Structures are given as C-alpha cells and as structure tokens.
Amino acid sequence: MPEYKFKNIMNHYPTIRISSSQMETEVLRILLKLGFQEKKARTCASVFTNNSLEGVLSHGVNRFPRFVNYILNDLIDVDAEPELGYSAGAIEQWDGKSGPGILNALKCTERAMELSKISGIGCVALANTNHWMRGGTYGWQAAKAGFVFIGWTNTIGNMPAWGALDNKLGNNPLVIAVPFGNEAIVLDMAMSQYSYGQMEKKTI
C-alpha cells in the first residue's frame, strides 16, 4: 500500500488503544445484554478477546459484530445446550442446537479428551452449530491438557477444485496441535492462501 494512502486512512480512522481487560469487559456487557447466562458470556468474551490479543484479529473482536448480528436475527440460540445424538465407543455425534459455536466446540473438544482417556482416541462430530471463530482455540485447549488434536470444519463452497472454474470446495480451517512442554505446537490454517476472515480484515 503506498505511503500516502496509508497516512490518509490513518487521518480518517485514528488508532485507539484499549486494554484487553477493557475489551473483554465490554464484550461481556454486550453479551449479557443479549441474554447470555453469565458463565457462557464470560467464556465467549474471553475467547474473542484472547483471539485478538494473540494476534488473530481476523477471528477475534473483528468478528464480534457479526456474532451479535446472528443473535439478533435468531441464527444463534444463546440458551441452547449441545445434545448427544449418537455414541459408539470412542465416537460421538453431537447436535449443537444452533447454539454459540464457541461454546459447542469447547464442549465437544472436552468430550473428545474424555473419550481418549478411556479408549486412547476420541472422535467427536458436531452438527447444527455456528462459527467456532478461531479453530486454534480448541487445539490449544487440547494440547495444553496433554492431548494431540486434529480438528476441522465444513463451510460454504467458495473455491474451485484445481483446474476448475466453479466454486465447489470450502476453504475449511484445519487445526493440528501437539503438546510441547508446558506449551503446544499448533497449526491453524485455511485451505487457501488467505482465510475469509483475513480478507475481511483488510477492508476494515
């Protein structure tokens, strides 16, 4: 981007710095106003804030207005609780009941870890949910608890297959995480050069 354009943008949209605690408090306030139970609201506010704080702006607070819009348009049920639909040993299928994707994904990651303690592996599928925001959140959740994690989601068809013209494939996020000492090594990537959220970030 040419320097003069950058300066012009900054003149119109000055940078405002706020603390992470202030950011999280404001997100929490809005979620409570939208009818979230306090525990659920605090969890979501923490995830949105940490995503931004850790540099993943494309899936942090930048996505929060859309999350609010989904709630206002009844696409997210703030009171929904995920429900087990099918179980076979180390495999489970859960119905997210159109609840917040963050909460549903955290729950299913926890279930996968519980299953792996029993069977050595846990495979959990989740349907009828909403955007889980940053996939790496759940990789960190599992790896820091001592588990290897592989996770992905489906999405709309917005990419053509190699050599084709029509959009048929989703730009699905893929997450692979392994424990590393007290931390973790986490791969969190899109299937293309950019995630949709990264492209959106450029327009802000």
Region locations from a protein language model:
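N-terminal glycine-rich anion-binding loops that anchor highly charged ligand groups
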Residues: I16-M23, F36-N62, I76-S87
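Long, hydrophobic, well-ordered secondary-structure blocks that form the structural core
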Residues: T129-A161, D166-K168
